[in-house]
Amino acid sequence: TVANPWVANRQTADQGRVVVTAKGEEQIIDVETKCTSFAYEADRVAAAVAAGEVEGAWPAMAWDDTMGNLTTLDSWRRAIGLTYDLELEEECKPLRGTLAKRDDAPMKYGKVEGLDKPVSKLIMGCDNQQIYAHGAAMWDDWYERGGNAFDTSWVYGGGKMEILLGKWVKARDIREQVVVTVKGAHSPRCLPDLLVQDFHESLERLQFDYADIYIMHRDNLEVPVGEFVDVLNELKDKDLVRGAFGGSNWTIERFEAVNEYASAHGKQGFSVLNNNLSLARMVEPVWGGCIHASDRVSRQWLEETGTTSIAWSSQARGYFLPEGERMKLGADNFACWDAPDNRARRDRAEELAEKKGCTPINIAAAYVINQPFPSFAIIGPRAIQETATSLPALDVELTAEEVAWLWGEE
């Protein structure tokens, strides 16, 4: 037993005690020490650093154990509504004092039609940050690594995600340096007048004067495409949308119909398709009304038309993680992806990852951003560690032959 297991004692050497109970008899073994528990921890860290290791050897606590403890503590705090003073919005400052892109930032960039700003090839999905302190830490780190693009929607968290992201952008004073996709018109509000209403509410939540990119989150087949094109162009004419329009979970046929109408009437059409595209074929819709563009026909159309793809669930929600990590997410998480052809793709990703010195999930993300058309991948890290392990995909260069082989198109 240890007198105080929670805080390493820096003042006195706590004596250890082992209590052994056998056949109803108790034996007490006192373990004398002249060192404080803090000294033991410091020595263990020093030994690990000297050996070039990233964590101390047993019995030191492993990183996974530490993170598990912190995750549990966070869940307890959420349950009782505890927020520390340092986590208050006005106290959540950048770790280095001022927010800036690091000199060694690994991010790469692409171009989206209608935007003067470069757009990071990986885009931060903003649909899971529940408190400002968490969001600010994630987004500060993202920006420092070179990430300048964010994806959010009117429907996420009942508006909470837009509010938190907007507060962070305002606090950091970086509105002109970031690209934020505003999405709306999600079912059942996929009607022209409600699109406009929700768009204005999104800008109000975000505290923005304009949207960089506007994407319709769903389509409504009962509404002629021209009605959507008309209201979107009214927003553009008021300088409320300064870049591209697009559709999420839209069929190619309806997407083309939008552009035919826009061309015939001298208006701006769609240039961004925001469907799922990943190395794993979407076997079942992740959510109702979801559409993928992973199939060969859709990818050929994207290439032939030069349409920009901004892919959601670009890493198939962890399908390419090692089995141990994959199972932590729960088997139900992969019902939308698991199939013999996708297992074969995962096997090929694992094989290629070994050759290229990266992870299979890096191969999965690289597959998306190495397509022969403008292609961006939305990722949804829940922790800074997940961001860090996703970014090596940027350095993975795939040939056209490797892209085809990964999908199974030899």
Label every PLM stretch briefly.
Residues 1-47, 55-64:
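NAD(P)-dinucleotide binding in Rossmann-like oxidoreductases
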Residues 219-410:
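Beta/alpha (TIM)-barrel catalytic core signal, keyed to glycine-rich beta->alpha loops juxtaposed to Asp/Glu
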Residues 204-224:
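Active-site groove signature of glycoside hydrolases
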Residues 91-178, 209, 237:
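N-terminal binding-site loop/beta-alpha segment at the start of enzyme catalytic domains
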Residues 47-106:
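C-terminal helix-rich "cap/oligomerization" subdomain common to oxidoreductases
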Residues 122-134, 183-194, 217-222:
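Active-site mouth loops of central-metabolism enzymes
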Residues 130-142, 190-206, 255-260:
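Short, acidic/polar
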Residues 176-187, 272-277:
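A short, structured active-site edge motif that brings together acidic residues
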